[in-house]
């Protein structure tokens, strides 16, 4: 069984050195994109993975498709669109490795995922689907609905990373309403502390669990340098970030989501997870994500389980 990720793949041009975009003199080209990152993490950790996305018929798209192939992510659901461009992100880093983004995204191939692209998917081989909030607009919105509705009916586990990017949506009210529209599909959600209020209207995760996330199986609540909280039924697990010097946090949240999902799928019975097992999954995901911040780039920083065990 496999993991299918639907949504964006783009190129991160990461500023070399510390400083704002206008101060950076050169950039390093890295493959990235929230859901593409999760596909690569799942593959690294032993799960067959597919990416359902659309890339431009351009050199950037060639680079990204070749990256997926090098990472052994199956590309049979990757389409190429000649009349749109591959999205780009320019990333600047501060002294802590935290990021600021400038995107070339509107009108890009990510928003051209079609219903025909979705119709090609064989759900009988898919155990879990992962998506995020960036691509649920324009043509791709309807395609997400089509896939997730079919997946829900087929009993496929659905994972969602809120991953807010306000500068990619013109109307933030529509952004909020659109995300809420997709929440009924979701079994596993990752939401950051700085995203919770926009999504739920409260800064209190306990309130959000009762009001907005009550139908979900697992809630991953990330708190940056303060670690994470993981909720499953009556269990609550708290993790702390290991003492690691961060160089670049690009893709760390995706590493957390992807590594937790991978461990969750390894569990024999998703309806019966002990607090001890949940704690082990959460600790693995926290440590895995932290280790990826010691290198620049997202996909290029991801580890196999053997590489992880050699470092931890």
Give, region by region, the residue ranges found by the protein language model:
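Hydrophobic beta-strand scaffold residues
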Residues: 49, 75, 158-160
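Active-site metal-binding loops of divalent metal-dependent hydrolases
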Residues: 9, 162, 255
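Glycine-rich phosphate/adenosyl-contacting loop at the front of the ribokinase-like
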Residues: 1-73
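Short beta-strand scaffold segments in enzyme catalytic cores
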Residues: 40, 88-92, 227-231
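Beta-strand->loop->alpha-helix junctions that form or flank phosphate-binding loops
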Residues: 54-56, 76-84, 220
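Ribokinase/PfkB-type carbohydrate-kinase core domain
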Residues: 1-4, 69, 96-237, 268, ...
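Conserved phosphate-binding/catalytic region of the ribokinase-like
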Residues: 149, 205-312
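Short, conserved phosphate/pyrophosphate- and ester-handling motifs at nucleotide-, phospho-/glycolipid
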Residues: 42, 192, 253
């Amino acid at each position: 069984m496999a993991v299918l990720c639907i949504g964006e793949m783009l190129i991160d041009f990461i500023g070399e050195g510390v400083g704002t975009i206008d101060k950076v003199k050169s950039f390093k080209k890295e493959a990235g994109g929230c859901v593409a990152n999760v596909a690569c993490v799942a593959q690294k950790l032993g799960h067959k993975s597919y990416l359902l996305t659309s890339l431009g018929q351009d050199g950037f798209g060639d680079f990204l498709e070749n990256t997926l192939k090098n990472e052994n992510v199956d590309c049979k659901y990757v389409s190429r669109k000649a009349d749109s461009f591959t999205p780009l992100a320019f990333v600047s880093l501060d002294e802590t490795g935290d990021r600021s983004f400038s995107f070339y995204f509107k009108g890009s191939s990510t928003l051209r995922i079609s219903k025909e692209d979705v119709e090609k998917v064989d759900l009988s081989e898919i155990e879990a689907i992962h998506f995020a909030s960036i691509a649920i607009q324009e043509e791709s919105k309807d395609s997400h609905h089509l896939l997730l509705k079919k997946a829900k009916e087929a009993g496929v586990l659905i994972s969602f990373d809120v991953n807010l990017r306000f500068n990619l949506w013109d109307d933030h009210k529509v952004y909020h309403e659109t995300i809420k529209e997709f929440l009924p599909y979701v079994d596993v959600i990752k939401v950051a502390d700085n995203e919770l209020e926009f999504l739920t209207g409260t800064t209190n995760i306990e309130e959000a669990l009762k009001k907005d996330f009550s139908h979900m199986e697992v809630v991953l609540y990330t708190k940056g340098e303060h670690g994470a909280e993981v909720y499953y039924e009556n269990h609550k697990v708290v993790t702390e970030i290991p003492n690691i010097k961060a160089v670049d946090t690009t893709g760390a949240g995706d590493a957390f989501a992807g590594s937790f999902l991978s461990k969750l799928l390894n569990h024999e019975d998703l309806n019966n997870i002990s607090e001890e097992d949940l704690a082990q999954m959460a600790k693995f995901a926290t440590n895995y994500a932290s280790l990826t911040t010691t290198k620049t780039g997202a996909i290029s920083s991801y580890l196999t389980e053997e590489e992880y065990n050699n470092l931890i």
